Regions:
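ATP-binding N-terminal substructure of ATP-dependent carboxylate-amine bond-forming enzymes
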Residues: 1-86, 90-92, 96, 103-104, ...
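Short coil/turn connectors at secondary-structure junctions
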Residues: 1-2, 52, 109, 129-131
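Short Gly/Pro-enriched turn/cap motifs at secondary-structure boundaries
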Residues: 59-62, 137-138, 162
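Flexible, glycine/proline-enriched loop segments at strand-loop-helix junctions
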Residues: 85-88, 110-114, 143-149
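ATP-grasp fold ATP-binding core
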Residues: 101-102, 126-146, 164-165
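Conserved ATP-binding module of the ATP-grasp superfamily
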Residues: 108, 144-165
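Short acidic/polar capping segments at secondary-structure boundaries
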Residues: 114-119, 138-142, 151-155
């Protein structure tokens, strides 16, 4: 039987969903094949992990999806699920990951990057050619700070919300 430690939690705004993910994995893992332990990442001590144990990463957001957990585990020779540190870092940065997809001719929706101090020009063709759009922060999970904008008078408000994350 293989030892699996399911880590969840963390300090990000996605702690609650991470906890739900960890508990769901623990509840549904095949107990006849795996000896599973559910562990809050705050209690993880890499020096106590056995060599043949696999870490199942259920940590969402900062610390779990940005490459930091992957780096910690890889640097200590611990096997884990999911992508490598470099892949996680790249995916965490939406601008960089979108650029890589475009470079490799993978279709992505049109986008506009709005820098921190950039003044918004609603007469820009990008805005004029759309009935609605989504505003997302460059980093963080897939749902925090995301707004669908159908009234462009509310675009500034959506951008302010995204910048919180």
């Amino acid at each position: 039987m293989r030892d699996v430690v399911i880590i969840y939690g963390g300090d990000s705004v996605e702690n609650e969903i991470s906890t739900q993910s960890g508990e769901g994995i623990f509840k549904n893992i095949d107990q006849s094949k795996f000896c599973a332990t559910l562990l809050n990442i705050k209690d993880l001590k890499v020096d106590l992990i056995k060599q043949d144990t696999v870490i199942f990463i259920a940590v969402h957001g900062l610390g779990g999806e940005d490459g930091e957990t992957q780096k910690l585990l890889a640097n200590n020779g611990i096997k884990f699920t999911g992508s490598s540190e470099d892949s996680a870092k790249l995916c965490w940065d939406k601008i960089s990951s979108k650029a890589l997809m475009q470079k490799n001719k993978i279709p992505t929706p049109p986008h506009k990057i709005i820098r921190k101090d950039e003044k918004l020009d609603l007469k820009d063709q990008f805005f004029l050619s759309r009935e609605s759009l989504f505003v997302k922060p460059n980093s963080n999970g897939s749902s925090f700070g995301v707004s669908k904008v159908t009234d462009f008078k509310l675009l500034d408000q959506a951008i302010k919300e995204a910048r919180k994350f």
